[in-house]
Amino acid sequence: MVEFFKTIDGRITEINEFSEGCWVNMVHPSSDELAQIAKAAEVEEEFVRAALDPEESSRVDTEDEQLLMIVDIPMVEKSSVEDGGQLFSTIPMGIVVAKSAVITVCLEDSIILRSIAEGAVKGVHTALRTRFVFQILLRI
């Protein structure tokens, strides 16, 4: 699944296609989707593919004018009805900062990114790439 978002009139809004200053949220993307987004954003396909390895460790990598950050994010593995507790695990999430966009890639839909996409986080400006990345990281 690939979704495109952009800040329009101070609100995060879903758009239909890639554009300058947008946020691309990819959840369990296909090979074709990875290739299309890598081409549109002019980033290395390996950067957008890196977070799809469940064993990928956290790291930061740079290549030309692009930055890849892999961070582990918590996911609820299962809930225990008996004691009301939850079991958590982590999965990698990739954040690619390109010249014209921020791309997030994850194997599963994350409440962290979903809350941003649904407008629960105030002051989000997708065109301000560094600030937007910090807003994502602060939600983790």
What function would you assign to each model-found segment?
Residues M1-I140:
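Peripheral, non-transmembrane regulatory/ligand-interaction domains of membrane transport proteins
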